[in-house]
Regions:
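Disulfide-stabilized extracellular ectodomains of secreted/luminal proteins, especially beta-rich
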Residues: 1-208
Length: 208
């Protein structure tokens, strides 16, 4: 067996002119879909070379409105936060869209993507790219844990049309979402939050 060396290590750095904030990796057959800033990269599993890319920039009007509200320009970009193959030819993508969350269904074709449908992404995708969120797609349904307002004060677990009680700290007390998964008939959400018994001590408690 040949010993592997540095030449056998493949790297993908994305756009080197700014931070991409990669958060998502979705395997699609022999490819990896990687979500970042304004882009979804389609990479070969063999050597991580880019085979194709999906570009989605926020409109000038959405960016302008984001800046008017005092948000730094770095955050008024379109950060991809949800990637799901809903069937063999359709990709669901949700992104922060300059603090105006949006979701799109894309048709997947050799060499390109086409927009099939667009809708608001509130309660599915965070406004702020710095907020942690999670999602899982089960039996044709998207389950999400995120925040549903501009200020990040309304945490939510959501599956259309159901959601957790708004502003109910007994259910969600400023959670920091970590992950989610389906097991049998249940969907589990994992997050950290300030434990009530340690409210004055700054202690965090893991919940699920």
């Amino acid at each position: 067996m040949r010993q592997r060396g540095a030449e056998d290590v493949f790297r993908f750095t994305g756009n080197e002119t700014h931070t991409d904030y990669f958060r998502l990796v979705l395997r699609d057959g022999n490819y990896l879909l990687v979500g970042g800033r304004n882009l979804v990269h389609n990479l070969s599993l063999t050597d991580l070379t880019e085979q194709q890319r999906l570009t989605w920039y926020s409109t000038d009007s959405d960016v302008k409105m984001c800046l008017v509200k005092g948000t730094p320009e770095e955050n008024c970009q379109n950060y991809i936060r949800i990637l799901v193959k809903t069937d063999s030819n359709t990709l669901l993508v949700c992104a922060t869209n300059a603090f105006k969350p949006m979701c799109r269904d894309y048709g997947v074709h050799p060499g390109n993507y086409t927009i099939l449908k667009e809708k608001g992404g509130q309660a599915m995708c965070p406004y702020d790219p710095r907020h942690n969120s999670t999602f899982v797609y089960v039996d044709g349904e998207l389950y999400t844990g995120t925040v549903a307002d501009f200020a990040g004060m309304d945490p939510i677990i959501y599956r259309e049309p159901l959601q957790t009680e708004q502003y109910d700290s007994k259910s969600l007390n400023a959670p920091n979402f970590v992950s989610s998964m389906a097991q049998g008939d249940f969907v589990y959400f994992f997050f950290r939050e300030t434990a009530v018994e340690y409210i004055n001590c700054g202690k965090n408690q893991r919940r699920n």
